[in-house]
């Protein structure tokens, strides 16, 4: 009883102390949930909550949807930061540069991988000042700049009516600048040129204006001169967006119809879809259906990205936001799908062109028992990256795995890195390959994405082979033209164009086999041009070529995961490099290991990894020599038996090193 009295007295003292504490402390105790509210956190923007009634004040004519497109490192994400600060969407000095680059891989590599959307509210200077309500709603989409993520750019542009084309004032127009311009041009977007980084000592905005005029027929007077780093000239960007980019089309009184732009998986909320409202209005509680699958859903939550998720309860015509509708499977959220009012007949929106996969690679769990975990991780990640194709496959060497199609080698690397960082998956990748077409003597054709699927000695004779090619655009300083032409010739390239952009820079266009550029072409190009080259490519036609399948054999047994298709002229060199690399990374066994590269039944390269040998004569200090011979013969027979039944473990590092085998020497 005495103990209970002490506890009661202690509790009363604590309560009196809290009662005398500041009001903030008492409010936290009385309303603990408020401490966790995202709307109270300054990192979610200065505006706080946005209501549906506020969004109703923005009809389509007061909405602008625009994207920022540029070459890598020309200042897209920094410009996006400044615009978010200028509109009060995020606080100045938020301490996180490139705010919209949210993935760990983006921050580590310094590149944008995923297109990100942010809604901003902005009062145009020419608008009347009779109300505190912002006059315009601006949806900003920051896009990647690398060629491998052009699919992200094209999907983002589908939700926009205009684009800011950002060009570095010192570097000028680069290869990806050209590619992104034509993506926007073909989408009929209004393009506003922004010459960025004018604060640099080497900036030459007049020269950049001339390049824009010569290459794109853009009036030099239309270019905006800015520095996203210092803020110089930024005050003219948003007024130009409002005045020069049209409002989104759409019918406000029609049944709701929206385009599914992107999606990602949340463990608690399920699939979160990013959508652009084309017609009508979407409200919480509405019933919607998918035009692709026919499945119906109830809208559980709807809102905008400001720049984090902000529930509004409604989205109106022309606005871009998110929808949570109880989708639990990533297969239900098909990028480019049309979501519409349930039990109504609407015409589906055009959607997107399907992604064309340029690089294929096998993906296997480092530990075979982790296959289900890897399958789960890939399913969740492909919800956020719909440009990856996934099919299950089985390898004799590596067990159950997946054959994955990517848009390029960087895309493949980023996908692997995200698997590891976001899901803790440890994977083994096989040698990347491209889709080939083989024609047999009877006229039948087959597309081969996995070299192991092509029999080394098929019953049908191979009559012809085709490989995919690309049109490569290379921009370089004029003094490096010679070495670059030599590099392209070594990679079996055909020159299509050779022009000068200005007195210092040249533009080269080549038709190159895709196989020749997917591994190390860009690194070599950067090396021979001291880092000044820029490179972009677009897929072209298939061309006939002299191709052969090369197998890697360990102790006479082919390793299907290491099979590759090479050009006949380079088979000898590539085979020699492969077996040499394998010899370095395979651990020595108690038996001898022969490593061979073979085309059909013909071995073109070989290395031998000698066996570890136990000193069986250690206890023989003398005596009859026949005793020693008997021990040696017994050891020899044992090693032969081990070689017949022994298995060779191939470390993960060996597969990684095979990716680096050069195609150029």
Swiss-Prot record:
GTP binds at residues 70-77, 142-146, 196-199. Disulfide bonds: none annotated. It catalyses: GTP + H2O = GDP + phosphate + H(+). Residues 34-53 are annotated as: Disordered. Its EC number is 3.6.5.-. One of its GO terms (molecular function) is GTPase activity. Residues 61-249 form the tr-type G domain. Residues 1-35 form a transit peptide. Coiled coil: none annotated. It is found in: Mitochondrion inner membrane. One of its GO terms (cellular component) is mitochondrion. It is a peripheral membrane protein. Keywords: GTP-binding, Hydrolase, Membrane, Mitochondrion, Mitochondrion inner membrane, Nucleotide-binding, Protein biosynthesis, Transit peptide. It comes from the Eukaryota. One of its GO terms (biological process) is positive regulation of translation. Belongs to the TRAFAC class translation factor GTPase superfamily. Classic translation factor GTPase family. LepA subfamily. Promotes mitochondrial protein synthesis. May act as a fidelity factor of the translation reaction, by catalyzing a one-codon backward translocation of tRNAs on improperly translocated ribosomes. Binds to mitochondrial ribosomes in a GTP-dependent manner. This is Translation factor GUF1 homolog, mitochondrial.
